[in-house]
Amino acid sequence: MDRAVSRVVLENEEREAKNTWRFVFRIAVLLLIVMTLAISAAALVYSMGASTPRDLASISTAISKMEDKITSSLSSNQDVVDRIYKQVALESPLALLNTESIIMNAITSLSYQINGAANNSGCGAPVHDPDYIGGIGKELIVDDTSDVTSFYPSAYQEHLNFIPAPTTGSGCTRIPSFDMSATHYCYTHNVILSGCRDHSHSHQYLALGVLRTSATGKVFFSTLRSINLDDTQNRKSCSVSATPLGCDMLCSKVTETEEEDYKSVTPTSMVHGRFRFDGQYHEKDSDRTTLFKDWVANYPGVGGGSFIDDRVWFPIYGGLKPNSPSDIAQEGKYVIYKRYNNTFPDKQDYQIRMAKSSYKPGRFGGKRVQQAILSIKVSTSLGEDPVLTVPPNTITLMGAEGRVLTVGTSHFLYQRGSSYFSPALLYPMTVYQQTATLHSPYTFNAFTRPGSVPCQASARCPNSCITGVYTDPYPLVFHRNHTLRGVFGTMLDDEQARLNPVSAVFDNISRSRVTRVSSSSTKAAYTTSTCFKVVKTSKAYCLSIAEISNTLFGEFRIVPLLVEILKDDRV
């Protein structure tokens, strides 16, 4: 009985235990369901609240604010970029130019102090105003695309005349020579007291100066030192060059006419002089018997020389001694240059015969008139290590007055059109140690010179002539690869007479609008031109030193004509 009761009690307890666990399980399941529903509801509410129309409308506002932040950030970065560009493209070059100016001033001042200590000279250092540093002897216009003749000269500008004029009716100032370096310029001309045709006695005026800018921004040439070489020496055909030691000048010493000189059998006396920064002038006779042993007449080219690689280079021309080694080396050599789009009517063999004869004009007794270049080492000693280069006549025409120029890294020889070829010629020139090599020239068809028939301005065929006039071109417009595109110069715009001086910019075919000195009947002669830039304003200027007729005081007055180079964008 008791065992039966115990079994019943045990079964009841087991049943109650099972019911308890079921209840716990059910409660747990219900709690999980409730929690799941709650989480789902919360998620649903959240998702519905996140995509309300109000929030959707605020998206564009948020994006706009983000755009503003990005734009502000970019603007800030652009300011940095602009500052970097200004520093690199504008301020750094100017700083370099100023540094160059400071260094040049310091070096020049030091050299002056040393020089002054040696000669008791207390002179100051000559150097152009900082406005010109980096604007002298450089490629002034570098342009591959613009028409060269879209550049043109302004009207002539009033500026300080740094060239003395004759003071009597019989006075004569002629044959200007000019050269300008990065620190100073040098100028010289011949002074004759009794008319321009007197060959027996003359003075030589020589000046050293710098470029200045006035308080109103005007360009002017300031003469710092000048001297009039009035002695028993009759210097002629002088060429001047600005060198680190002052103004180097090469002259011939003559007492006879040019025709008589060519008839002689001895070379012409030559002298190398130097006008120092302290105003002292010294010179030394050249060893003509060695240097010019193959010549009967020899002259500097009148145009300026150039300082290249510690040497000064001067143009030379004159007559070779018949059957001398130099004369024999040129025998049979010739070159024919042709006008643009203007062929020769003569037969080829006749052209060649006339071209060969052009080197031996009858005026000088059939002597071969030859071009040459003389280089002299620039040191405290004058006339040191002179070397004469005689280029082949397969490159050069008959010898004539000329000029050696350096612009940028390029060197050129201008040769006056004394022979049959009227357009201006610039021979590219390379130098190696003491010698020079000339290459086929740039020609400027519209930059002509007047001449006597059959070698007048429009002439096109080879002929034997001694004619023309010295009117050098200055390299002005370059390609980016440094080849020459155009030049500036002042030409005499007449067929035969030395009349009508006009300034213009020239390419190989044509010319720009011109600036005239006066009427077409204005008498003129030699012109020599040099261009430079005022770096601060980026304005390019050109100076043409021209011999202009002067009816009251002397036959000619040498006038420095100054123009600004402008651009016509319509061309």
Curated annotation (Swiss-Prot):
Virion surface side: 48-571
Pfam families per record: HN (PF00423)
Membrane topology (Intravirion): 1-26
Sugar attachment sites: N119, N341, N481, N508
Keyword Manganese recorded: no
Top-level enzyme category: hydrolase
Residue numbers spanned by region Involved in neuraminidase activity: 234-239
GO biological process assignments: symbiont entry into host cell; virion attachment to host cell
Region named Important for interaction with fusion/F protein: 124-152
Disulfide bridge positions per record: C172-C196, C186-C247, C238-C251, C455-C465, C531-C542
Domain of life: Viruses
A Gene Ontology term for the protein's cellular component: host cell plasma membrane
Membrane topology according to the record: Single-pass type II membrane protein
EC assignment: 3.2.1.18
Keywords: Disulfide bond, Glycoprotein, Hemagglutinin, Host cell membrane, Host membrane, Host-virus interaction, Hydrolase, Membrane, Signal-anchor, Transmembrane, Transmembrane helix, Viral attachment to host cell, Viral envelope protein, Virion, Virus entry into host cell
Catalytic activity: Hydrolysis of alpha-(2->3)-, alpha-(2->6)-, alpha-(2->8)- glycosidic linkages of terminal sialic acid residues in oligosaccharides, glycoproteins, glycolipids, colominic acid and synthetic substrates
Main location as per UniProt: virion
Domain description: The C-terminus (head domain) is involved in binding the cellular receptor.
Subunit structure: Homotetramer; composed of disulfide-linked homodimers. Interacts with F protein trimer. Interacts with host CG-1B; this interaction inhibits viral adsorption and replication rather than internalization.
Function in brief: Mediates the viral entry into the host cell together with fusion/F protein. Attaches the virus to sialic acid-containing cell receptors and thereby initiates infection. Binding of HN protein to the receptor induces a conformational change that allows the F protein to trigger virion/cell membranes fusion.
Protein's UniProt name: Hemagglutinin-neuraminidase
Origin species: Newcastle disease virus (strain Iba/85)
